[in-house]
From Swiss-Prot:
Keywords from the UniProt entry: Carbohydrate metabolism, Cell wall, Glycosidase, Hydrolase, Polysaccharide degradation, Repeat, Secreted, Signal, Xylan degradation
PANTHER family: ENDO-1,4-BETA-XYLANASE A (PTHR31490:SF90), GLYCOSYL HYDROLASE (PTHR31490)
Signal peptide: 1-30
Name the record gives this protein: Endo-1,4-beta-xylanase A
Reaction catalysed by this enzyme: Endohydrolysis of (1->4)-beta-D-xylosidic linkages in xylans
Provenance organism: Paenibacillus sp. (strain JDR-2)
Domain SLH: 1279-1342, 1345-1404, 1407-1462
Protein's gene: xynA1
Catalytic center residues: E651 (proton donor), D706, E775 (nucleophile)
Temperature-dependent activity: Optimum temperature is 45 degrees Celsius with sweet gum methylglucuronoxylan as substrate.
Annotated EC: 3.2.1.8
Amino acid sequence: MSRSLKKFVSILLAAALLIPIGRLAPVAEAAENPTIVYHEDFAIDKGKAIQSGGASLTQVTGKVFDGNNDGSALYVSNRANTWDAADFKFADIGLQNGKTYTVTVKGYVDQDATVPSGAQAFLQAVDSNNYGFLASANFAAGTAFTLTKEFTVDTSVSTQLRVQSSEEGKAVPFYIGDILITANPTTTTNTVYHEDFATDKGKAVQSGGANLAQVADKVFDGNDDGKALYVSNRANTWDAADFKFADIGLQNGKTYTVTVKGYVDQDATVPSGAQAFLQAVDSNNYGFLASANFAARSAFTLTKEFTVDTSVSTQLRVQSSEEGKAVPFYIGDILITETVNSGGGQEDPPRPPALPFNTITFEDQTAGGFTGRAGTETLTVTNESNHTADGSYSLKVEGRTTSWHGPSLRVEKYVDKGYEYKVTAWVKLLSPETSTKLELASQVGDGGSANYPSLASKTITAADGWVQLQGNYRYNSVGGEYLTIYVQSSNATASYYIDDISFESTGSGPVGIQKDLAPLKDVYKNDFLIGNAISAEDLEGTRLELLKMHHDVVTAGNAMKPDALQPTKGNFTFTAADAMIDKVLAEGMKMHGHVLVWHQQSPAWLNTKKDDNNNTVPLGRDEALDNLRTHIQTVMKHFGNKVISWDVVNEAMNDNPSNPADYKASLRQTPWYQAIGSDYVEQAFLAAREVLDENPSWNIKLYYNDYNEDNQNKATAIYNMVKDINDRYAAAHNGKLLIDGVGMQGHYNINTNPDNVKLSLEKFISLGVEVSVSELDVTAGNNYTLPENLAVGQAYLYAQLFKLYKEHADHIARVTFWGMDDNTSWRAENNPLLFDKNLQAKPAYYGVIDPDKYMEEHAPESKDANQAEAQYGTPVIDGTVDSIWSNAQAMPVNRYQMAWQGATGTAKALWDDQNLYVLIQVSDSQLNKANENAWEQDSVEVFLDQNNGKTTFYQNDDGQYRVNFDNETSFSPASIAAGFESQTKKTANSYTVELKIPLTAVTPANQKKLGFDVQINDATDGARTSVAAWNDTTGNGYQDTSVYGELTLAGKGTGGTGTVGTTVPQTGNVVKNPDGSTTLKPEVKTTNGNAVGTVTGDDLKKALDQAAPAAGGKKQVIIDVPLQANAATYAVQLPTQSLKSQDGYQLTAKIANAFIQIPSNMLANTNVTTDQVSIRVAKASLDNVDAATRELIGNRPVIDLSLVAGGNVIAWNNPTAPVTVAVPYAPTAEELKHPEHILIWYIDGSGKATPVPNSRYDAALGAVVFQTTHFSTYAAVSVFTTFGDLAKVPWAKEAIDAMASRGVIKGTGENTFSPAASIKRADFIALLVRALELHGTGTTDTAMFSDVPANAYYYNELAVAKQLGIATGFEDNTFKPDSSISRQDMMVLTTRALAVLGKQLPAGGSLNAFSDAASVAGYAQDSVAALVKAGVVQGSGSKLAPNDQLTRAEAAVILYRIWKLQ
């Protein structure tokens, strides 16, 4: 027992001896309850006391008086004023605002002191302007005094305690022998389980023969919402409703209060003596808890406090007495609460004050207390190198074989708990000579539950000499009296020196948590569990307070990993993990198990061995599989149902796999993979499932867990793996899943695109498994510093994520943060969490707590993407800057992605009909490629999105091309290397890269836009220290094309008038293009703002004669009408006969505000008789459009298309010769996130706006493109229509929204779509005709089906479908329009409709992959096979379900897929 504790106990014993015997027990009980917040006996120094006024404070000994038996005291002398005193600051002694404490001060006045009459000691709460009296006691010479008072801290009026005197005693010196401050623990009532039956039966299960049904509109006292559980069909007392302890979270040995609100109907027959009973039961025991009388039309309440004893009962039952056994009743509400301490508790034994730490210099030629962490390192005091001024020695560290090996020093005796310390070590790398990362860290606690916070790290070389590592850490826990500091290296064999190690307090004392914050777990209690990753230090003191306040589930950071639980074969070490789990459960939280199978933090013996040459080789499959199964099953059985879920396998998938369709090839080549094979993941889950099958009462979910899951290639590979494993298992086990859930780790950074997170989340949800966000953190800033703008950005991303999670809450079980505060995070240098190192909320907390509010108040500034042009021309790829580059636009590569601003440069681009050419000139005098990672070498990268799709993930046309200064290349994906060429040249201060990229996914042409970026990687001493780009500042270009700039192809066909490009032959005003088309430049005249380009018959003939047929057999003529000054209207005048021709050619009018593709038969079968016609484009007026429509159109382009003949506008409508129009439009960044919602509205003469279903945004053209068979007014718009009942069909939401926005489909209500409802045959035909904009043959004598009335709302669409041969009906001339349509009939109708449009589906499709292929009717087999091969139909799991009724959601998806085929 320490001296302080002895003295405190003696005080209590002395007080007890003065109390009458009858009152002893209550006082003793009270003495056990308070928590000691601060206790000082001045045994060593002045403690936390500071001088007030002119007083002198001196620590003395030998001053024994009543209450101060050890004689140590603080002497307060040199007093001339009342305020010449001793102060104790609240912040220093751990007092928190709003909390109530009891202060007791024991003091004394010397026997020879002069004490005036009325002199008193005062205890006050003060600051510089306020003086709050608390207590007083008389001064008397040779006499002790006691000051005691309970008070509540209010930091707005006082900041410290002061022990002073009254005015009469202002000159009296005195002693303080002891100051004790305690707090009574407060209690709070936690809700453990609450069910109001608002949506279903909750956790209630049937007992006996009772029927349980969820009902509404049963309002009674205590059940205002009317939702209730109806318990009927009762004939026995036990025909009742049960609530299993395990299901509702009740734990053995804990005490709860249960309250049940019930009701009996007015017309119920209620025998005399009938009662409701609440019991705790199992199959053999029935423990009565409470009763209440049944009465017709009356509510009843059952309530009881009880303690769970699982040896005699396993569930609660709401039943009846014998007399009431036939009475049906309602349960409107069941509430179970637990009363727990919300603060206080048992105080740890007082620790001795921290000892002073003397800087360790090794000048005494000893190791200064340092030892090897593994015990195998060689630590030598040496004079080979030294850092100490005027010194000679340092400690040399050698013999390391693993990254965590290194010198370690115990420091717990130098720590005052709760204080922050600055730790410094000087290091010098010995070997290797190349760059190596050295890290200064601390260990808190021993064993599997320890924590290892990083304090500082630097990447250095041997040439750097001595380098300082320094960082701060607050020791809220002393780790069970085990604290160390150590130096390690990511290079497992690196050797180094250390010197001048210091460890000093910063003076920042214990901190409290913010009790006035909204607990995260409460905010999301109706959505998902909120979790955190913990070590042992998080289960005590202030950290435990924060953990319990905000979280209801935890994950062990290290304590349950394989190396912690089975370090050697058969030696299971559960002690630390057991202690952690027991503590977690005792504190009312749940536990998630992490992890059973992982390639890291697993002992080598599990899957490898040494061969005869001492090389590490894989174990044989059988032995490794036995080790895997034994570990999984032993661990799971040991912990049993103390956990709610397990990460069975962790991080098995490669990052960004190039072929995610082959998930087995995408797996990491881990030791488990090498020993067992690609099925090791499945084998692990099979072993885990066996344990659960043996213990059916355990409600435990089995998870696959992985990181970088926002990368779409990786997410697809994970999806394919889980789907394959689950589908095969389900087929053999009656639909049961093997893998219950996917853990999305969520280790993100401030530039993570949440759209990618959403794509992955919805992908995993579509598997039918639950999802957990398992290890969430978001890095921002560096070097332990977080600027305000980055803090806001970090919070904004957290807000975006939690908005996303809440939208998908039905499928998310828990969201777990990977750490509570920045200081203890494994990514501490980058400040990734919601709370700072002092446990105070950051902006990130507020982003999480109210995402919508935070995003509204902190909307980020949008930044336009860089734009540039690439000129037409073909350079020689030799690394030399030829003259052809001279007029190419220079793109500065100077947007930095990292704090350090290093190498920069410029880029230029050229193009021809096959390739893109890029020249990058880099200014950099120190070139380095020491790192084996290509991206950490001095290099350039070109990012290319050929279709300019701006997707947040890579499509087949996207690529990353990397070339270092020595012309060594790397690619992502690897397949894009084909046809790539590059050359480099170096000078003393720069290097040049010239490269050629084949344009394989697009046809290069003027005005074609490519997504494009250039990046320069600057390496120093084997590490990338700077990244500069032309456009992207996020660093996500390797997976996200939305961050690229835009490169527009230009200059083709200039005829040699420029210095860049290829000269093409031309005759007069006709230019022949390399692709075989011709460009005709007509004479243009502008009159009164009307620009008309006139094409004569001779002009057109000349252009057609020079044009060569394209791949489709048609000749192409481009009519180029350039911009004209002061022109508001543009027209192209053509010979009328040129548009009545059946010859195969196509005209494209390229004018200022539109591109119009005109078929040669545009005017066929029309009665236009003039010699010339003009196609005119003008900016349209919206005067006849209502205000709401005008507002929706906004400032987007609106054009009026018209056909003019003889000076008059004539109506044109030709369904057989559609015209294609492209309206240039630059969408906003927000619109580009959902380009499928950019479309065209047709505006008729009355101002009514109707969507054009075929319209869509073409990113490559930078225009909204549509086909029309009539001319009118058209407007570009962005329309987003959605419905509120799509949460359960995330796989269909994009399709439903896109089709609804185009007016193809409509909802069943204002905000409902009814996605699960079946769809009628007539309705599907109508949707099909509308989506594909099908037109009839023009005949009016088509006989309709006999069961279709002429006034049917779908009549016109069905008539079109019948005329076109799509709808053939049944043999009796009926169509059965109101019958539900089967999936196979849908497929037949769809293939017929596509055939009408001339869309050829691929032949030779096979249905062998589907288990129910034999169920497809003969008439439907070809259609089904064709749609499967085209990707329009994908089936559900391994089934086609051809005879199932088509749902509205499925119909929308099919329509969307065929719409995209157009």
